[in-house]
A protein has these predicted regions:
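Membrane-interface helix termini and inter-helical loops of multi-pass transporters
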Residues: 6-7, 81-87, 235-246
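Juxtamembrane transmembrane-helix termini in multi-pass membrane transport proteins
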Residues: 14-83, 160-176, 201-202
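Alpha-helical transmembrane segments
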Residues: 15-26, 91-106, 175-186, 252-256
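Membrane-water interface of transmembrane alpha-helices
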Residues: 31-35, 109-120, 189-203
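Membrane helix-loop-helix hairpins that form the core translocation module of multi-pass transporters
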Residues: 53-129
């Protein structure tokens, strides 16, 4: 969520434009390595005995996650008149997100390098490791509960609070609710598609599905590193920060387009019978 602070400086003045930006940023949040790792694990766990739940794991996970985001956003918006975010919150939250994105990208690329060409790559996330037992969730409520647990982190809460403070200051409570809803909807779309995608891959056992996971691992790691690099540059250079703020909507759209292309490429690779080495 490194790009989210750019929302505050976005040149878009129309509420609809801000809602679109918030929705696209929600899609970006949905491709965090922790989200993908958790959804992957729960989908695989339920694929055999509960295939219907497996296909909807991403949907229920993101709904639980989104409830926390909505609660934080509305709570901050309702108290915005009596509380002002400290100056250190935005840079601290940004650097926390930058560090987490860079670390997770490095871990996932290392896993990609270690994995044999014909084997599936398992995405890594610190929360997925911390809540490893919870990832065996075998009911809709349990999956939503995991989404709630994953939302209880400084980067998620701080960015939600920042979005609320920004929206409340410039557009009011109704606008805050719209922005938060658009953000959560974008996240639901990506996480829901990810759960469906993993379920489809499980139905296609063999080298093709394994190669597809390698495609996604490289794509997600690249997005994480690129986002971290841009966020760090924006924090260190006012010129870069201004450019990124001016083009924040297009940057977010580009990220989502890359994710969509990698999903489609993964499905195409999974269908190909001939071996394709990506390492």
């Amino acid at each position: 969520m490194v790009i989210l602070p750019m929302l505050a400086a976005s040149p878009l003045s129309e509420l609809l434009g801000l809602a679109i930006v918030a929705g696209v940023l929600g899609m970006r949040h949905g491709v965090d390595a922790d989200h993908l790792a958790a959804i992957d694990a729960m989908t695989r766990c339920n694929a055999g005995a509960r295939p219907a739940l497996a296909r909807r794991t991403g949907l229920w996970f993101s709904l639980g996650h989104g409830l926390v985001v909505l609660a934080v956003v509305l709570a901050v918006a309702l108290t915005a008149h009596a509380w002002t975010a400290p100056d250190w919150l935005q840079p601290f939250g940004a650097w926390t997100s930058i560090a987490m994105l860079a670390l997770l990208a490095a871990l996932n690329l290392a896993a990609w390098r270690r994995t044999a060409p014909g084997a599936a790559v398992e995405l890594t996330g610190w929360r997925s490791r911390l809540f490893n037992g919870a990832l065996r969730a075998c009911s809709r409520r349990a999956v939503m509960g995991v989404g709630v647990l994953f939302a209880v982190s400084f980067d998620t809460v701080s960015q939600a609070a920042l979005m609320a403070a920004t929206g409340a200051a410039s557009h009011g409570l109704a606008a805050v609710a719209l922005l938060a809803g658009a953000f959560v909807l974008g996240m639901i779309v990506i996480d829901g598609l990810n759960g469906w995608w993993v379920a489809r891959l499980i139905q296609r056992p063999g080298a093709g599905a394994a190669r597809a996971t390698r495609v996604m691992c490289v794509a997600i790691s690249g997005i994480s590193l690129g986002t971290a690099a841009l966020g760090a540059a924006a924090q260190l250079s006012p010129t870069v920060a201004g450019w990124a703020a001016k083009h924040s909507a297009w940057l977010a759209v580009a990220i989502v387009a890359i994710v969509a292309a990698s999903f489609l490429a993964g499905l195409a690779v999974a269908r190909r019978p001939s071996p394709l080495r990506l390492a």
